Amino acid sequence: MASRVQKKDDDESDFLFENLDKGQVIQEKRAFNESPIHPRKCSLVISQFLYLLSRGDSFTKTEATDIFFAATKLFQSKDIPLRRLMYLLLKELSTISQDAIIVISSLTKDMSHKIELYRANAIRILCKITDSSILPQIERYFKQSIVEKDPHVSSAALVSSIHLLKVCPEIVKRWANEVQEAISNKSNMVQYHALALLHRIKQHDRLAVSKLVSNLIKNSLRSPYAQSYLIRCCVEVIEETNTEDRIFREYIESCLRSKNEMVAYEAARSICTFKNVSNKEINSAVGVLQNFLNSTKPTLRFAAVRTLNKLAQTNPTAVIPCNLDMENLITDTNRSIATLAITTLLKVGNESNVERLIKQIANFLGDINDEFKIVVVDAITSLSQKFPKKYKHLIIFLNKILRDEGTLQLKQATLDAILTVVNNIPESKEIALTELCDYIEDCDFPDLSVQILHLIGQEGPLTSSPAQYMRYIYNRVLLDGGIIRAAAVTSIAKFGLLYEPMKEKVVILLQRCLLDEDDEVRDRATLYLKLFKENDVRYLNKVLMDDVPVPLNNLQKSLELYLHQGDFSEPFDIASVSTVVETYQSPLLGDGKSPFSTGASKKGDSVTGTPKSNNASNNNNNNEESSGPESFATKLSQIPQFSTFGKLLKSSEYIELTETETEYVVNCVKHIYREHIVFQFNCTNTLNEQQLSNVSVKMVPSDPKLLKYECSIPIDVLPYGEPQQCYVAIRYIPANGYPLCSFSNALKFKVKEVDPSTGELDEPGYDDQYSLERLEIVPKDFLNRAFVGNFSEEWKKMSEDTQLVQTFSLVGVKSIDEAVKQIIKTLGMAPAEKSEVVTPKSAKHILYLTGKSLNNQLIYVRARMKLDQSQTNTDVELTIKSDDESLNDFVISAFIEK
């Protein structure tokens, strides 16, 4: 009788390692010690270890060391597949185990082996375990491997060198000749890796990078990977040096005609990111992307439509020729491509097809992930500004996204979009509030409920039928948690303030809240009831309607620090709170910038995919910024020389005085007191062969009459890689005016050579100095931010008799948004009435700023600006009001040289 075939359960897994136990596998390592070696058995055990590591299982140092040294016994095996697995295991464990350095002799022996596989893998492991003391001993092996004819060995050496460049930059830089030779290798991958390494070696020398790129353009690389990288290098040179040399642009344009799709796409993408681009250049790039839209390859279609989506934000006219092709992509089976196609069409489309596009998006909204939904929401937001009459369709669509399942990030982006529509289109207010009232009945995110209640309280009383919203608000008091109940109480009180007919009902509802179990709810209700009974409309307006001028998280940290310090002789000053907030950038669209620059990269290594370690300067900054600017006051007050200076009034941002990858990295922070300025120099020694002692900064002022040298605090010893601070204090007389001047600076120190292998110092050393960038004292060093509830009212109150009006031009500032940022940065004052927000492509704008001097005199600034006829400069009319004419002159001196 025929045997019965059993059907395997679909849920049954036949994966061998699924239920693997770490302890059991560790016991299996004894197979490595067997003699003779059984390749098949050892290969299985190594595969199990590699699976555990990839799964995220952690090994202690002892466990990792035992496994590592057991695996080294496999160097005796001649089985190539087993050796390959052994190299992989050693590479993974090398960063965990102790004394991995012992295998260097075996690895260097393999680097001379006739089998290329051994040589390449040995190099990869050496890269992991080598430090600055070992690399000089095996340097020759790396140099030989870089110029090796076998592409596997050469590529392994080049990529390993990219990693070693972070550990021992001075040694790797000596290999530039070998790397230059490797660029001529016939292998596509070797050319690519050689160019990547050579660029990193030279990246802090702009002239050297420019020469490198120029030479490679003439020699025409064969590798498409290297050509793509070279295009990015060209973009870097163009952006960093602002060069007008056509050779770089012409090379990128020539790559548009490349037969290789990757090279052609990279060229088109780069042209789309240029700040100054001609119609001919952009049309050629868009033409290439248009061809890719019709490609059979999903990756090409996705890359092209994503680039066009980004371009549509800055140059929608250039994208219009692709509309028909993108409409064909709306039905693409890849939902990511379809979403980007529709959002791009929304940015460049016309009013007649908006409804159709929105309906098409709604049909497959559930099939795309939240990241792409955020892209859709952003497109809808920009669409509301372009076609305000379509607000009903936009609000309904956004509300659908809000109600569907999704992350808080998506919900927040959607709510922000609805708020933008309400702010820009007053007619949309009632339909938006109605939809949001329904949403908070079943909202899973307290943060969103609080924001919506705030909006209803602000806008609900001003609608045609305010009473309809009260039921939704009071339901939150009855049904939700303490945070939401407190927000609901405030929202109810706003109705009583802004809509007089409901005042009595509001008082009744607030009285019911007096028995709430939550302190915050009871306290708010008590305060509002007291103000209503006293009919204190002015204070009610201030409490209920004025926005907090700083981010609440920053305010909380500053208040906690104020309480912790325990010095209550002076009241808390809200102007000391930082206004910096984090913003979200969708990773789908990217930033359109080159992935590398002459400074330290923030996004990591573009070739190897590993994160870059922060440079010494950045580490130095982060150590102090982690606790906020207020930490400076605590630290400086503990230094005896500065303890008599009084209260710290202001600290500047970090000012770089050297390049980030030089021998000595120095930046400065200016600390302003009532009669003193303390310069804090953060110094880092990046040379492991040197130890510095008696480190100080010599400052020579451009106008010595304005100030007097007070004291200097040097660094006793500055070893390799340990950031430390030295200080210089000067004194000035406020009655004589603030000391606006510049300083030439030099870092002075004694150098003692260090043997990196033993740590021994070469006494007695020698004196040396290192030139630093000039440092300036500018007006914003003596100006603090100030916040007012209503700028317009305060502006009117100030007399025009003492106002100062000055016109000037910001040369080379080609956009209003850039001009606004430059003025705010130059004065260091606080924007008022959200005037820092600029409408896209606006040709004129008015910016309002408020600040105060160090003696607490208020300053109000109004900056009217517009682009000139050439569209290359911005004309500014600056009006300054304060009670002191000399203060007005002082503020304007930030822009006008007297």
Swiss-Prot record:
Disulfide bonding pattern of the chain: none
Native organism taxonomy: Eukaryota, Amoebozoa, Evosea, Eumycetozoa, Dictyostelia
InterPro entries in the record: ARM-like, ARM-type_fold, Clathrin/coatomer_adapt-like_N, Clathrin_app_Ig-like_sf, Coatomer/calthrin_app_sub_C, Coatomer_g_Cpla, Coatomer_gsu, Coatomer_gsu_app_Ig-like_dom
Localisation per UniProt entry: Cytoplasm; Golgi apparatus membrane; Cytoplasmic vesicle, COPI-coated vesicle membrane
Each HEAT repeat, start to end: 62-99, 170-207, 280-317, 319-352, 353-389, 392-427
Cellular component, GO, one term: COPI vesicle coat
Main location: cytoplasm
Organism expressing this protein natively: Dictyostelium discoideum
Membrane topology of this protein: Peripheral membrane protein
UniProt-recorded name of the protein: Coatomer subunit gamma
One example GO MF annotation: structural molecule activity
Similarity remark: Belongs to the COPG family.
